[in-house]
A protein has these predicted regions:
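N-terminal hydrophobic/helix-forming segments and targeting peptides
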Residues: 1-232
Length: 232
């Protein structure tokens, strides 16, 4: 399929003449974009620009709020951080990992909903908004920490989906996992439609369930817990 270019796209302004168009102030070189407003669609979806990854920032802030409101005393120090420049090289996560030197990292980001036209489920998986957080399998994801996430989801009746990545997750998980001699890391993803557009879409229940999964998982981690499969 031919990608969009100046030969196959057009702007429909509802005009019938060049003069009518110019009267609207539209001319060659005018900047065109989608209407930039956050909205709730059909009572189910949040729609807006840059939900990737402002949604992640919201979800981890909600985890912090729940911990405080429920007066939870964790047996370890917890850093809740939001990174920058993930899209151009995981730079923020690399700096955070070097500065904090974490023992464990739970990362949240978005992943593609694959239910829309022109997406190949064979290559990208069968993932859907509204069916729960996505738990990833990848070289950067520590298997025992991942199993703990899944166990928490099952015990708390939190719906979840599975996704596999052969090389990279494409998220900050890759930065944390290979920092400081290796950090047990896991990725919880939020299904999202129309990534990198001004109309990104996520399901309200998925947002709530990502928050629940991170929160409940934190309550199960022990101080000094060893996630290694093999020890000396």
């Amino acid at each position: 399929e031919e990608s969009p270019n100046l030969k196959n796209i057009f702007l429909d302004c509802g005009c019938t003449s060049k003069e009518e168009l110019e009267a609207l102030g539209i001319h060659v070189g005018s900047v065109v974009t989608y209407e930039d407003e956050f909205m709730i669609l059909n009572h189910r979806y949040y729609v807006g620009r840059a939900l990737d990854n402002r949604a992640g920032g919201f979800m981890i802030a909600e985890v912090a709020r729940l911990l405080k409101e429920n007066k939870q005393k964790l047996p370890f120090g917890l850093y809740i951080v939001n990174s920058v420049q993930e899209e151009i090289g995981l730079r923020g996560a690399e700096m955070i990992a070097d500065w904090i030197k974490p023992n464990v990292a739970i990362v949240t980001d978005v992943t593609h909903d694959t239910q829309t036209p022109m997406i190949n489920k064979i290559t990208q998986g069968d993932l859907a908004c509204g069916k729960g957080p996505v738990v990833s399998y990848a070289p950067a994801v520590q298997i025992n920490l991942n199993r703990q996430l899944i166990d928490v989801a099952q015990k708390n009746d939190i719906p979840f989906q599975r996704q596999a990545s052969s090389r990279f997750t494409g998220t900050d998980t890759d930065a944390f996992a290979y920092s400081n001699g290796g950090v047990p890391s896991a990725l919880i993803s939020l299904p999202l439609r129309y990534m990198h557009t001004t109309v990104e879409m996520v399901h309200k229940e998925d947002v709530d369930n990502v928050i629940r999964l991170i929160y409940e998982t934190l309550l199960t981690i022990e101080d000094g817990q060893d996630f290694r499969s093999f020890t000396k």
